[in-house]
């Protein structure tokens, strides 16, 4: 789909990652699409940071609209005593977050200079550090279709499994594999099936640009993300205490509190469970809580989240880079615009349904 419509990659990329997260209940499904997004954008002459940034943001905010995500299931249970049911929550969150992603994509489409005018890109191009894949050079192997079907089948299985083990569906109780572990296991099994059934020379895999980018991203995820979460986990109680005290004095600041808390807690579910009960207990209106729910998706602010780091590493043009001031990275503005739009739309839609 992305390869067939390269000219609109900045808008189609977040649609794909949003829908995948919506169905699977986890943003880690975006890992499989990031290399394709980067390659298609580069081939079209589009600055890869534009579609990559909003695609990552879409994969994060879609958690607050996914029927099977832990954050939505937990929040729905909290809202039930206040007369807001599960379906009403979804009826508000799904359209508002999707429209917000499209607004964010529109903003991202104007971020940064054109790729051909980027000095970093030109420097890397001169040094031969960028691999350009043109249509003339692309050779489609006869087994490509089979490999694609295996890959799509694996994604479909992951989505179904995530739904089956979720609290809202509950077909599988006490699953042996959690959602994230299942994604890794199934996708590795799919990779093995592709290698064996399509008779791929395994020795050539480490030389592939996508494999090198992916492994580099793995190292970044293991190191930087682990380090960041270690620091934050040591101060979780303090974060909750400060946020709770702020909400008690200023209930209207719920969206801001959730934004900054999720930035540190690295989890939509953890932020929801930590702060939403306190917010509802001190008298925050259900409409305000539902409208502010999207703000628990500010995982892009600190550039240490796995999908964000993967996007940076998979863009060999250098357009998706983290600035020396930490916060000046291409994910920040589209992310803030998307969350702000989702909250504003949440009040509009929520006012009609609650």
Describe the role of every protein-language-model region.
Residues 2-5, 33-49, 91-97, 154-168, ...:
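Hydrophobic alpha-helical transmembrane segments
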Residues 8, 12-84, 268-298, 350-352:
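Hydrophobic transmembrane alpha-helices that form the pore/transport pathway of multi-pass ion
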Residues 9-17, 21, 58, 92, ...:
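Alpha-helical transmembrane segments in multi-pass membrane proteins
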Residues 13, 17, 36-43, 48-49, ...:
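Helix-loop-helix junctions within the multi-pass membrane cores of secondary transporters/permeases
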Residues 25-29, 75, 81, 105-121, ...:
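Transmembrane helix-loop junctions in multipass membrane proteins, especially transporters and channels
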Residues 84-139, 298-354:
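Juxtamembrane and boundary regions of transmembrane helices in multi-pass small-molecule transporters
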Residues 119-232, 333-341, 347-348, 352-354:
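Hydrophobic transmembrane alpha-helices of multi-pass small-molecule transporters
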Residues 178-252, 256-271, 277-282, 292-296, ...:
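Membrane-embedded translocation segments of transport machinery
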